[in-house]
């Protein structure tokens, strides 16, 4: 198991945790002093009140919670958000309201999930042409024959 160092910015912060043995992500909670309202079509940056030290060769991905998306149209604007291993600031989440109603966020509401992922660095090699494949240059919808 990989160790992730985490710092609370306030004593009353609830740390992320896996809700089940099979969970891939840990829920992130909103660290807001008062209710935040997100109007339809609006985006807001929401604090979590935590900072982390991610081990080298890992990243954290911030992803939407499926329940918020399905029930309220709430998503993350830059999904998945990437937190690099050398970042040491507070984790914040850019929420967007794609729904039709005003959405309210209160302190400790679960707003996103955090997934720790290994990364693989690659060495780029510029070439004049690429190897051929059956698919070739077929793009969007090209495999729906």
Question: Each PLM stretch: what is its role?
Answer:
Residues 1-145:
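DUTPase catalytic domain/fold
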């Amino acid at each position: 198991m990989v160790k992730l160092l985490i710092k609370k910015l306030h004593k009353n912060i609830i740390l992320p945790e896996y809700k089940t043995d099979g969970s891939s992500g840990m829920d992130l909670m909103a660290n807001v002093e008062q209710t935040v309202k997100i109007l339809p079509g609006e985006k807001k940056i929401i604090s979590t009140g935590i900072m982390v030290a991610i081990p080298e060769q890992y990243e954290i991905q911030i992803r939407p919670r499926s329940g918020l998306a399905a029930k309220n149209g709430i998503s993350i604007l830059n999904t998945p958000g990437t937190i690099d291993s050398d970042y040491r600031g507070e984790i914040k989440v850019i929420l967007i309201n794609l729904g039709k109603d005003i959405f309210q966020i209160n302190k400790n509401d679960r707003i996103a999930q955090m997934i720790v992922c290994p990364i693989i660095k690659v060495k780029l090699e510029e070439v004049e042409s690429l190897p051929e494949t059956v698919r070739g240059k077929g793009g969007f919808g090209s495999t729906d024959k």
